[in-house]
């Protein structure tokens, strides 16, 4: 192999390592059996959520995780491999990919990491079933508003009772 080709591959490995290190989460999938239209639809869904999906050679991924906390992912680098990276919402890739995999049997989630910690397939599925950040904030706001509503109703009831008595 020429020196230029080796340098190019080393740069690709470095870029992949940088993407892994910068990501809040990365989910490894096998996309074998998906049609071009299905892959395009999946990429669009991921892109709309701010997630980048890249098809990366297994050997490059293997070298990119070498010496990192993600070495346990090496066993997932078999067959056609794509990786969905998220820099913002660590749960979003798991949610979108699980939903897509439920609708398309050909997509298989193989593993990944969430918030810098390698997760098993079962753990990724648990995360995927959790409410998203926006849903959790909405639930929190509702929980905080409920006691205030009760107090407001009680104060209003007392005021109405005093108005009737007067």
Curated annotation (Swiss-Prot):
Gene Ontology terms for molecular function: large ribosomal subunit rRNA binding; structural constituent of ribosome
Q: Which GO terms describe its cellular component?
A: large ribosomal subunit
Give one Pfam family.
Ribosomal_L10
Record bears the keyword Hydrolase = no
CDD domains tied to this protein: Ribosomal_L10 (cd05797)
| Alphabetized UniProt keyword annotations | Ribonucleoprotein, Ribosomal protein, RNA-binding, rRNA-binding
| BP terms from Gene Ontology | translation
Q: Which InterPro entries match?
A: Ribosomal_uL10 (IPR001790), Ribosomal_uL10-like_sf (IPR043141), Ribosomal_uL10_bac (IPR022973), Ribosomal_uL10_bac_type (IPR047865), Ribosomal_uL10_CS_bac (IPR002363)
Q: What does this protein do?
A: Forms part of the ribosomal stalk, playing a central role in the interaction of the ribosome with GTP-bound translation factors.
The record's annotation in HAMAP family points to: Ribosomal_uL10 (MF_00362)
Q: Which family does it belong to?
A: Belongs to the universal ribosomal protein uL10 family.
Could you describe the subunit structure of this protein? Part of the ribosomal stalk of the 50S ribosomal subunit. The N-terminus interacts with L11 and the large rRNA to form the base of the stalk. The C-terminus forms an elongated spine to which L12 dimers bind in a sequential fashion forming a multimeric L10(L12)X complex.
Q: What protein name does the entry list?
A: Large ribosomal subunit protein uL10
What organism is this sequence from? Limosilactobacillus reuteri (strain DSM 20016)
Q: Lineage of the native species?
A: Bacteria, Bacillati, Bacillota, Bacilli, Lactobacillales
Gene this protein is translated from: rplJ
């Amino acid at each position: 192999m020429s020196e230029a080709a080796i340098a190019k591959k080393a740069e690709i490995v470095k870029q992949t390592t940088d993407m892994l290190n910068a990501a809040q989460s990365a989910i490894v999938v096998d996309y074998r059996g998906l049609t071009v239209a299905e892959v395009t639809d999946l990429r669009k869904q991921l892109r709309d959520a701010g997630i980048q999906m890249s098809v990366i050679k297994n050997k490059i991924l293997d070298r990119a995780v070498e010496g990192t906390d993600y070495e346990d992912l090496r066993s997932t680098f078999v067959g056609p491999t794509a990786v969905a990276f998220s820099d913002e919402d660590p749960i979003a890739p798991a949610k979108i990919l699980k939903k897509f995999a439920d609708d398309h049997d050909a997509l298989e989630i193989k593993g990944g990491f969430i918030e810098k910690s390698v997760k098993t397939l079962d753990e990724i599925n648990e995360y995927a079933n959790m409410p998203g950040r926006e849903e959790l904030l909405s639930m929190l706001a509702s929980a905080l508003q409920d006691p205030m509503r009760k107090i407001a109703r009680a104060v209003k009831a007392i005021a109405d009772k005093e108005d009737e008595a007067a």
